[in-house]
Amino acid sequence: MNPTGSYKDRIAAATIEDALRRGLRGWIGTSSGNGGASMSAYGAKAGLPGFLCIAADAPPEKVRSIVPYGATLLPMSQLGIAEMDAIRELASEFRLKLSVTAYRYNPEGMSGSEAIGSELINQGEFTHVYVPAGGGGLLVAVARGLGGASTARLICTQPEGCDPIVRFLNREIVEPQIVSCTSTISGLQLPAPPDGKLAASAVRETDGWGCSVSDADAWLMQDYLASKEGIFVEPASALAAAALANDVKSGRLAATARPVVILTGSGLKDMRRFRSTDLLTQRMFTIADLRPRLEAIDASEPPARR
């Protein structure tokens, strides 16, 4: 179980454990939302004060979920490599644990997510693992967790409007870094991913590939997973599933393949798409309004068992 609704609880648990072991005074970090919620929760449990530099455009749901834990929130208009390096210096100066979900800054914490790979091995045979990538750290963690126990190919999935690792894998750019992002997918908007090269190396070592997916395809997959599978995930998670669907349609993925998709966070983390769908502000219904709707169901074929 991930108490705050994303896999980053694993990273936070390992990060706080390292902070306590080293006798640090608290923690400081950056986040687009999920990592901040995780660190704030685990930091509160450990009694360690936290200072979170959060992206100013983070989804309100993510920000609100952090507030109850009591960490100090510092909204920032920009959180690039320069800002992260500066925060690392402050962490060292004030004896705080640096909490950034990247091996480049927090290898001890990132090790907490490597168990995802080893847990996959216990689930049975699989041939491909589709992983959403922002900074690239999760993909690296999955690769390290799999180790030599699996021959599965790793597939790096990113939004078309922010896909430096995919473009680097495709040899379109010489560094996994671009000037800016146009994607609106929260958590995947990193033009200069700190673990970009590590992630690309992990993909190449498994003979995998990169997939760029439109924001629109990610949203469609989010709706599909919720309405057909009963799984409500945030757009960043749905993007990886959309990449799989696109590879199936194009024939890139063989019919005999047994793919796995890493779904990283709950859909309750980012509800921006659904704010205009406020059913409580529409007209009220009566019991009499139910009959025509129920009759429509009665006339349809029952769903086949899956």
Q: Where are the language model's segments positioned?
A:
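PLP-dependent amino-acid enzyme catalytic core
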Residues: 1-306
